[in-house]
Amino acid sequence: MRKKLLVVVCLLILILMLPGCGKTAGPLDDYQGIDVVSPDWVGKLDAAGDAKQMLIVAAFSADATDAWISLHEKQSDGSWHMVMTSPGFIGKNGLGKTREGDAKTPVGIFHFNRAFGIADDPGCAIPYVKVDQDTYWSGDPRDGYRYNELVNLKDLPGLDLESGDSEHIIDYPYHYQYCLNISYNEEGTPGLGSAIFLHCLAPAKPFTGGCVSIPEDHMRFVMQKVDGSTAVVIDTYEALSGGTDWPDSTWPQER
């Protein structure tokens, strides 16, 4: 079953990488989600005890760049249901982020603390910032320059733009239509790493610089569903599931 899952994911990812598949040219179709019982291991995760909602990023191995991303919600009876599932990408060098520029996705339990994007607010529970020409994500390690935060150049006119460490959000029209910041290095320790987002899939690259990417229609759905209390759980599929297979009953079924 795991081999079958990997083959299907690889095929879906190849399709999504085709020009025009990551972002639609016309009006974006609404992804309506799914509603199926989550695999048993989801409810056994450490984050499941306190969380009412979990976004799970399950990489196929520690050095893989592809992953299966799913959103789960706790029901009134304590059971978990999966409401979104999608193939996606993680860092070019897999999992295990420890420093700026290592092109790895962090492992652990996080939350979303910022919502922003080039597009209009899709209806976020987290306060949303529509970016403009002056919006950057700061990678400037100097004191007072708000490393690992969304900033406006009008407020920080001295931000270092020459090094390329700070991301100019509108320069990434595919990736950053919609973005949620994952709370890695929330304290903003310079050099530990910055700009770890859940964002839209872009064509051509089967990896990210450390972020997590999913198709734009799925991303918009996620932004409409999650809030600041949503647990973001990232690890290998084997570590998360204990090596169990992903049941056939949880394959995507459109509502």
Residue spans of the language-model regions?
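A conserved hydrophobic position in a structured secondary element of the catalytic/binding core
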Residues: 214
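Positively charged n-region of N-terminal signal peptides that target proteins for export
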Residues: 1-4
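Hydrophobic helical h-region of N-terminal Sec-dependent signal peptides
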Residues: 9-15
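C-terminal motif of bacterial Sec signal peptides marking the signal peptidase cleavage site
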Residues: 17-20
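Cell wall/extracellular polymer interaction/catalysis modules
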Residues: 26-208, 218-255
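Signal peptide processing junction and immediate N-terminal pro/mature segment
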Residues: 22-24
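Short cysteine clusters
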Residues: 211
